[in-house]
Amino acid sequence: STATDSSYYTNQQHPAGGGGGGASPYAHMGSYQYHASGLNNVSYSAKSSYDLGYTAAYTSYAPYGTSSSPVNNEPDKEDLEPE
């Protein structure tokens, strides 16, 4: 998938570069965006895996933090202070 995107990008850039001076920047921008899109797709896949791992780790910590219930302790302490 990545190789095809790279090939397409190079193919587009070649004619775009030799096309016209005025349209060169516009074409270049479009080509770059296309390339970025392909790269983003790969990044998404990697991020998905990373996100999944991070979520799993966070979920592992989540129950521990919830068990601690520090927020519940706050109102209790505040109630005791005014008394």
From Swiss-Prot:
<dbReference type="GO" id="GO:0021544">
    <property type="term" value="P:subpallium development"/>
</dbReference>
<dbReference type="GO" id="GO:0001228">
    <property type="term" value="F:DNA-binding transcription activator activity, RNA polymerase II-specific"/>
</dbReference>
<dbReference type="GO" id="GO:0000977">
    <property type="term" value="F:RNA polymerase II transcription regulatory region sequence-specific DNA binding"/>
</dbReference>
<keyword id="KW-0804">Transcription</keyword>
<dbReference type="GO" id="GO:0006357">
    <property type="term" value="P:regulation of transcription by RNA polymerase II"/>
</dbReference>
<dbReference type="GO" id="GO:0042475">
    <property type="term" value="P:odontogenesis of dentin-containing tooth"/>
</dbReference>
<dbReference type="GO" id="GO:1902871">
    <property type="term" value="P:positive regulation of amacrine cell differentiation"/>
</dbReference>
<keyword id="KW-0805">Transcription regulation</keyword>
<dbReference type="GO" id="GO:0000122">
    <property type="term" value="P:negative regulation of transcription by RNA polymerase II"/>
</dbReference>
<dbReference type="GO" id="GO:0021879">
    <property type="term" value="P:forebrain neuron differentiation"/>
</dbReference>
<dbReference type="GO" id="GO:0021772">
    <property type="term" value="P:olfactory bulb development"/>
</dbReference>
<comment type="similarity">
    <text>Belongs to the distal-less homeobox family.</text>
</comment>
<feature type="region of interest" description="Disordered">
    <location>
        <begin position="63"/>
        <end position="83"/>
    </location>
</feature>
<comment type="function">
    <text>Acts as a transcriptional activator. Activates transcription of CGA/alpha-GSU, via binding to the downstream activin regulatory element (DARE) in the gene promoter. Plays a role in terminal differentiation of interneurons, such as amacrine and bipolar cells in the developing retina. Likely to play a regulatory role in the development of the ventral forebrain. May play a role in craniofacial patterning and morphogenesis.</text>
</comment>
<feature type="region of interest" description="Disordered">
    <location>
        <begin position="1"/>
        <end position="27"/>
    </location>
</feature>
<dbReference type="GO" id="GO:0003682">
    <property type="term" value="F:chromatin binding"/>
</dbReference>
<dbReference type="GO" id="GO:0051216">
    <property type="term" value="P:cartilage development"/>
</dbReference>
<comment type="subunit">
    <text>Interacts (via homeobox DNA-binding domain) with POU4F2; this interaction enhances retinal ganglion cell (RGC) differentiation.</text>
</comment>
<keyword id="KW-0539">Nucleus</keyword>
<dbReference type="GO" id="GO:0032868">
    <property type="term" value="P:response to insulin"/>
</dbReference>
<dbReference type="Pfam" id="PF12413">
    <property type="entry name" value="DLL_N"/>
</dbReference>
<dbReference type="GO" id="GO:0000976">
    <property type="term" value="F:transcription cis-regulatory region binding"/>
</dbReference>
<dbReference type="GO" id="GO:0048755">
    <property type="term" value="P:branching morphogenesis of a nerve"/>
</dbReference>
<dbReference type="GO" id="GO:0014016">
    <property type="term" value="P:neuroblast differentiation"/>
</dbReference>
<dbReference type="GO" id="GO:0048701">
    <property type="term" value="P:embryonic cranial skeleton morphogenesis"/>
</dbReference>
<keyword id="KW-0221">Differentiation</keyword>
<keyword id="KW-0217">Developmental protein</keyword>
<keyword id="KW-0371">Homeobox</keyword>
<dbReference type="GO" id="GO:0045944">
    <property type="term" value="P:positive regulation of transcription by RNA polymerase II"/>
</dbReference>
<dbReference type="GO" id="GO:0021892">
    <property type="term" value="P:cerebral cortex GABAergic interneuron differentiation"/>
</dbReference>
<dbReference type="GO" id="GO:0046533">
    <property type="term" value="P:negative regulation of photoreceptor cell differentiation"/>
</dbReference>
<protein>
    <recommendedName>
        <fullName>Homeobox protein DLX-2</fullName>
    </recommendedName>
</protein>
<dbReference type="GO" id="GO:0021893">
    <property type="term" value="P:cerebral cortex GABAergic interneuron fate commitment"/>
</dbReference>
<dbReference type="GO" id="GO:1990837">
    <property type="term" value="F:sequence-specific double-stranded DNA binding"/>
</dbReference>
<dbReference type="GO" id="GO:0045746">
    <property type="term" value="P:negative regulation of Notch signaling pathway"/>
</dbReference>
<keyword id="KW-0238">DNA-binding</keyword>
<dbReference type="GO" id="GO:0007219">
    <property type="term" value="P:Notch signaling pathway"/>
</dbReference>
<dbReference type="GO" id="GO:0097154">
    <property type="term" value="P:GABAergic neuron differentiation"/>
</dbReference>
<dbReference type="GO" id="GO:0045597">
    <property type="term" value="P:positive regulation of cell differentiation"/>
</dbReference>
<dbReference type="GO" id="GO:0048715">
    <property type="term" value="P:negative regulation of oligodendrocyte differentiation"/>
</dbReference>
<dbReference type="GO" id="GO:0005634">
    <property type="term" value="C:nucleus"/>
</dbReference>
<dbReference type="InterPro" id="IPR022135">
    <property type="entry name" value="Distal-less_N"/>
</dbReference>
